[in-house]
Amino acid sequence: MTIKRKKVSVIGAGFTGATTAFLLAQKELADVVLVDIPQLENPTKGKALDMLEASPVQGFDANIIGTSDYADTADSDVVVITAGIARKPGMSRDDLVATNSKIMKSITRDIAKHSPNAIIVVLTNPVDAMTYSVFKEAGFPKERVIGQSGVLDTARFRTFIAQELNFSVKDITGFVLGGHGDDMVPLVRYSYAGGIPLETLIPKERLEAIVERTRKGGGEIVGLLGNGSAYYAPAASLVEMTEAILKDQRRVLPAIAYLEGEYGYSDLYLGVPVILGGNGIEKIIELELLADEKEALDRSVESVRNVMKVLV
């Protein structure tokens, strides 16, 4: 008898992709197919086998395979894209656009061919533009092509707030809107610690410093690593989104969604609060923004559109 589980394919077997695959398997969310280019097929198979051999120790039942053949990804429920060239110290997100856009288009054609009903979650940077590129190439409904940045950016924001207050991170809630870059918009007014507004707990200048650190969060880790970029928190964020989809949890999460008039913008992907469930993005939630918040979001949108101009 064949065991029928959900199926998730992770494209890109680097640090983020491999970590995502392992976390998905550990949580028994799905069988996992880890995919990379033919030149890296053996290392990809090796990573997958290594993860599988951890299953008796970690106590999880999930099959994991490594491959370079997209036929192995057929009929995936969710496809997570982490592939692309890595961001290096001093490299702007704009520098990544041309190369990663070509990579996205090639990957997307294979996904659409083998898993036409899948939901695609994109991580590859610059993620707002890359998600748009995938959407245009796939021809999927907008609800089924989603970018990941807000969960990660919000996680960083929550981490820094918890450290500042010496509170549990479990009790910190918040939202980060906009593009995944230096112009992202952490919404302090919609952020709480145990239901208490942050503005009543943390002095304004400290909050501003935390907001600024959140904006530079990815760059901070890139600088510390010296080579490569963050992968544990990005992988955990991808898994949270994938779990919400596979289990139809209808989670309220920040995600990169295609806008058609929401917040006053159209024809771009931008980080906004959404309801994430079995159909992908079930609904975009429009928050009322103050004038300064809307101005900040406008700047973020301008940055995203400037990156999109480089799309090939």
UniProtKB/Swiss-Prot annotation:
Active site residues of this protein: H180 (proton acceptor)
Protein keywords: NAD, Oxidoreductase, Phosphoprotein, Tricarboxylic acid cycle
Phosphoserine modification, residue list: S149
Single GO BP term: tricarboxylic acid cycle
InterPro entries: L-lactate/malate_DH, Lactate/malate_DH_C, Lactate/malate_DH_N, Lactate_DH/Glyco_Ohase_4_C, Malate_DH_type3, NAD(P)-bd_dom_sf
Listed PANTHER family: L-2-HYDROXYCARBOXYLATE DEHYDROGENASE (NAD(P)(+)) (PTHR43128), L-LACTATE DEHYDROGENASE (PTHR43128:SF16)
The protein, known as: Malate dehydrogenase
